[in-house]
A protein has these predicted regions:
Chain A
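Phosphopantetheine-dependent thiolation modules in NRPS/PKS and related acyl-activating systems
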Residues: 2-38, 48, 52-82
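Two-component histidine kinase catalytic core, primarily the HATPase_c
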Residues: 42
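Conserved alpha-helix in the HATPase_c
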Residues: 45
Length: 82, 395
């Protein structure tokens, strides 16, 4: 997958768990909790969706690496090529 | 033969707007079936029916705003003869204060109603787009805001983008002014009628944290637990020891509840708060509580709560999650008589066996109704929650 495809997939899963977010208004460096208002339950639902889509384990210790769309895209790209 | 009417979804609700029918005349319904979606100050709510029968006639059109108690449908039971119902007299129906309703496509024979998030609904209405023409990518094929936006790209753009209410990243489908009014009405009533008392207690969470980390390490994400589920479960179980915290206060006084319908305060992005309940939570294990919480949060976000969930709570838990402040002192949600608040769990200096050590802890608070209980009983309640959290693996 290209970085653009990974980012698009991430945003799609983010909108899936938070359908009230406007995809056009999400910035690459928006913090999922502080800026986009995800709570811990939303975040876990997002991790579940990403786990299903990419078949990656995403342990709890890696959660900080998903803090923003740009960090998450970088993390997912790294894990997918690892 | 009986009438299905606009339900009251809270003491402060005066009217609701029928958004869609999920049944049509001739359909058989069972108790608990979801038959309609009504938009209220709390957003779109799925309305369940509380009797079995056959829909004889729909008496209201999608788009109509109707007062609580207004007839929505006629239900025939097995004994009924053919219905002989006068058609609804339009002049009796109060005129909506809003402009004419968006055209919601009727529920047709082709595949039934289309679930959609409130944001998607509102955007589609703004654009004059029938939801049935939009491919849904949400759970169960639900139409999401992004689907509506994608749908518009295939069409001529509207001359100007309609103004959104709420913040730039808020929830456009929800009228935040109305929701704020509903919250104000309920909280004013609470502060006017309920003599609150407040208690606070620090609870060490290292036992719960250790158990949680060990449990989650072996699980895929969709089976992982959150600390919030352990906090809710401990609260629900502690009520067995202090039943006077669980129930409803009505005109006749306090009525304890045999079941624990545990309300969860869920904050909405852009503002506002809804506290839907997990019914019959008293015997649920951690996994089931977690699953119910996930389901409630997901459906709150997607605008798919049911009326029983928002009207039948017997206590509320309000948790600030993992990134909030230390403690919250809540306002009881009438007619309930207690609210348990949890601040953000944080590593704090704890004294254990005379030694100062850093450890994860949370401040639990109780707001309770002095007409029903005293601080002494409230203290027993918080102490029991503490005790249960020290043994998170107990069945």
């Amino acid at each position: 997958m290209t970085p653009q495809e990974i980012r698009a997939a991430f945003i799609a899963d983010l909108i899936g768990i938070a359908p009230d977010l406007d995809p056009a208004a999400i910035g690459d460096d928006d913090h999922l909790q502080d800026d986009l208002g995800l709570d811990s339950m939303d975040f876990l639902n997002l991790v579940s969706a990403l786990h299903k889509r990419f078949s990656l384990p995403i342990p709890e210790s890696d959660y900080p690496r998903l803090a923003t769309p740009s960090k998450a895209a970088a993390y997912l790209a790294k894990m997918l090529t690892a | 033969m009986s009438l299905f009417t606009m339900p009251s979804l809270g003491a402060d609700m005066e009217e609701g707007k029928l958004i869609e029918w999920l049944v049509k005349p001739g359909d058989h319904v069972a108790k608990g079936d979801i038959v309609a979606v009504v938009e209220t100050q709390k957003g779109a709510i799925e309305i369940e029916i509380f009797e079995a029968g056959q829909i004889s006639a729909l008496l209201a059109e999608p788009g109509q705003t109707l007062p609580v108690g207004a007839p929505l449908a006629q239900i025939g039971t097995a004994q009924d003869e053919a219905p002989s119902v006068a058609p609804p007299r339009q002049e009796q129906l109060p005129q909506a204060a809003q402009p004419p309703a968006p055209s919601v496509a009727p529920v047709g024979g082709s595949g039934g109603p289309r679930p959609a998030s409130p944001a998607a609904r509102a955007r589609a209405a703004d654009l004059g787009l029938a939801l049935e023409t939009v491919a849904g990518s949400g759970p169960g094929g639900a139409v999401l805001l992004a689907d509506v936006e994608a749908g518009t790209r295939l069409r001529p753009a509207p001359p100007t983008a309609p103004a959104r209410d709420g913040g730039p990243k808020g929830r456009p489908g929800l009228d935040l002014t109305e929701m704020r009014r509903a919250i104000a009405a309920a909280m004013s009533r609470s502060k006017r009628e309920i003599p609150h008392y407040y208690l606070s207690h620090e609870i060490a969470l290292h036992a719960a944290q250790g158990w949680l980390a060990a449990t989650n390490a072996a699980r895929p994400p969709d089976r992982r637990l959150l600390m919030g589920a352990l906090l809710v479960r401990a609260t629900v179980r502690a009520l067995a020891k202090v039943p006077e915290m669980n129930g409803r206060f009505d005109e006749g006084g306090f009525v304890p509840s045999a079941t624990v319908n545990c309300g969860l305060a869920i904050a909405l992005r852009g503002g506002g708060l809804i506290a839907p309940a997990i019914p019959d939570a008293q015997d649920l294990d951690s996994d089931t509580i977690m699953q119910r919480m996930r389901d409630l949060v997901a459906r709150t976000r997607a605008g798919r709560l049911r009326n029983s969930e928002i009207t039948q709570g017997t206590i509320t838990v309000s948790s600030l999650g993992e990134t909030g402040v230390d403690a919250m002192f809540g306002v009881i949600y009438p007619p309930q008589v207690a609210l348990v608040g949890f601040g953000a769990p944080r590593v704090r200096p704890l004294v254990q066996d005379g030694i100062l050590t850093p450890g994860l802890a949370v401040t639990a608070t109780l707001a309770a109704d002095h007409r029903v209980s005293d601080g002494r009983r409230g203290a027993v309640f918080l102490a029991e929650i503490d005790r249960l959290l020290q043994e998170p693996d107990s069945p």
